[in-house]
Amino acid sequence: MLLVTQMLFNVGFYLVVPFLATYMSQSLAASGTMIGLVLGLRTFSQQGLFFVGGALTDRFGVKPILLIGITIRITGFIAAGLSTTTPQLLIAVVLIGFAAALFSPAAEASFSVAGRSTEDSGIITRAELFALDTVFSRVGALIGPILGAVLLPIGFPLMCFIAAAIFGVLLISHALIVPAVSTPPSASVWNSLTTVLRNKLFIAFAVAYSTGLVAYNQQYLSLPVELERATGSQDAIGWMFVFASVFVLLLQMPLARWAQRRTATVALAVGFISTAASFALIAILAPFAPAAGWLGIAPILVMLMLLHIGQMVAVPIARDLVGIIAHEEHVGTYFGFLNSFGGLAVLISSLVLGRLLDFAHTPQPAATLPWLVLTAIMAASAIALPKIATIARSRKAQV
């Protein structure tokens, strides 16, 4: 049931969020910096506050935190649908983000506990369960943009209200049908927080891994800009998400199995090198006039493929590594902090990249700058994460 829930979460999310940048630029006349700020705050209010949801999950359990989070997200989508100015939309977007700060760590903790059980039983490994989670999530990420692309001509507010209705169904199903999931109890929220913050290896891992969320967030921030540079409009943005979702559905499990046969060191290095290459490609091409027709979109499609290959290889391995670094305790808080570091990284990078992306709408030498910055930080993580994984695995072997 958790897998189906993840799918529906993404249907509602991807019905609206991929179109935020387009709506703000075309309907609210927002600048690139303002769009970067709003998207960055959306991610930070979600990922940056995950540690709150994680600690509350460890203290009070999965189900109550899930229900509260879903209720807040319904409120956020309704508020977004009623927004007519950028400040109003900003408040709504923060609510949408904070809601996930509550329910997402609860779901992550559930998968970690369930994955350990299935691995001990010899059914599937925890990394493979996380990969299945990605597949189900991608089904939702496929349906959401398709539905959004169809509804976009009707209006952004209607899309928001439909998303609210989807989460309303989830609220009822979780309240009445979905059973509670048991996680290892925590003596207090403070105990969970201090335990995580004292784990220096985890802090290093979270900082290095935070760039992965920065990369993923570029689908909402940088992709529309590159699409406009290549085609003259952002109209095809929904179909770019559809392409990415189909690509992930086809390759997630094969690539996850490939990564499982390698060490975590190799998988993380390959994943982040692929992500760095995706941005390096656009950095090379951005200063030049795009080719005519579909050839102009080809580099964007290659960028998306390389980006998602990197995610598909690295993310299941990294999520499994969290449980190892955490010694299987306080997993909700650990996952919360992992995403909080990512959210902070996205907020900072969005402000910087949002400004640089103002130069990337048209071919010019300065258009390469945001893509060079992204390439550099992904390359840094490709170097750091394998070293951290080696230390974590060696400590586990000594226990």
Located regions from the model:
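Juxtamembrane intracellular "pre-TM" segments in multi-pass secondary transporters
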Residues: 1, 177-208
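Short amphipathic helix-loop junctions that connect adjacent transmembrane helices
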Residues: 18-33, 221-236, 240
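Conserved MFS/SLC helix-loop-helix module at the cytosolic interface between two early adjacent transmembrane helices
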Residues: 47-84
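Helix-to-loop junctions at the C-terminal end of transmembrane segments
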Residues: 49-61, 250-264, 357
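Cytoplasmic helix-loop-helix junction between adjacent transmembrane helices
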Residues: 94-137
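A membrane-interface helix-boundary motif in multi-pass transporters
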Residues: 152-165, 355-378
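C-terminal membrane-cytosol helix-exit motif in multi-pass small-molecule transporters
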Residues: 165-183, 384-388
